[in-house]
Regions:
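N-terminal helical cap/lid subdomain that shapes the substrate entry/recognition surface
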Residues: 2-89, 93, 100
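Substrate-recognition element of Asp-dependent hydrolases with the DxDx(T/V) motif
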Residues: 73, 91-121, 131-132
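A generic structural signal for short
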Residues: 43, 82-83, 105, 136-137, ...
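Asp-based, Mg2+/Mn2+-dependent phosphohydrolase catalytic module
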Residues: 1-5, 113, 117-218
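Residues within well-ordered alpha helices
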Residues: 30, 57-60, 97, 119-120, ...
Length: 218
């Protein structure tokens, strides 16, 4: 039996390997068409998204307008329809085992419902019990704790019955805001600044998917 009744999973670079395979390449293609002088490296892209989210990076580091941010998201939606990120090895087994034991699987992500739905169907053959995605709007997306509060309300759960799993600080901030345990998806990390922060602040830090699996069912 698993330690928790509900997993609340980030999507990009937690369940699927997306930054290097989809999100950054889409960003490069779009920014080279609009502001080639503002191109940043993959490492800087990841650091900026960690520190202030994708939208914050676009506003504060790249100085894009709101229209340009929205256009960039639409560009990404088209790009990702034909560029599908692979799931991390082992996640299929973890999620199937968790569901078989009666566990709930929810997603809180800055990705879109369309892509989360497709990725779960293709990689795992089922849909999450609840999804909280880009379409919520900025006011209710991570790091706002709306998703966790709504999950607890809908499924009559206490904070300690959930586990938030994310590679980014906004998931950590959301979990902390409502007392939900937080596990860091360290298997996607290579930046020492990100690793140091998440090791120091997360309830649990896992360097590999297999270590997360051992903890969850241990």
């Amino acid at each position: 039996m698993a330690r928790y009744r509900c997993l609340v999973l980030d999507h990009d670079d937690t369940v699927v390997r997306s930054a290097e395979t989809v999100n950054y390449p889409a960003f490069v293609e779009n920014i080279m068409q609009t502001h080639p002088d503002r191109l940043i490296s993959l490492a800087e892209f990841n650091r900026q998204c960690f520190e202030q989210s994708y939208t914050g990076m676009c506003r504060n580091a790249l100085h894009l307008t709101e229209d340009e941010i929205n256009d960039g998201f639409e560009f990404w939606k088209v790009y990702v329809r034909t560029h599908i990120p692979p799931a991390y090895d082992g996640f299929d087994r973890i999620l199937r085992r968790f569901r078989a034991g009666g566990g709930l699987i929810c997603v809180s992500s800055h990705s879109s419902v369309e892509n989360i739905t497709r990725d779960y169907e293709r990689n795992f053959g089922f849909q999450p019990d609840a999804m909280y995605a880009w379409e919520l709007g900025e006011a209710l997306r991570k790091p706002d704790p709306y998703a966790l509060h709504d999950i607890m309300r809908r499924f009559s759960l206490r904070p300690e019955e959930l586990l938030m799993v994310d590679d980014m600080k906004n998931g950590y901030d959301m979990a902390r805001a409502c007392g939900v345990p937080f596990a860091c998806a360290g298997w996607s990390h290579s930046d020492p600044v990100i690793i140091d922060f998440m090791r120091k602040n997360s309830d649990f830090y896992f360097e590999s998917v297999s270590a997360f699996e051992d903890f969850l069912f241990g």
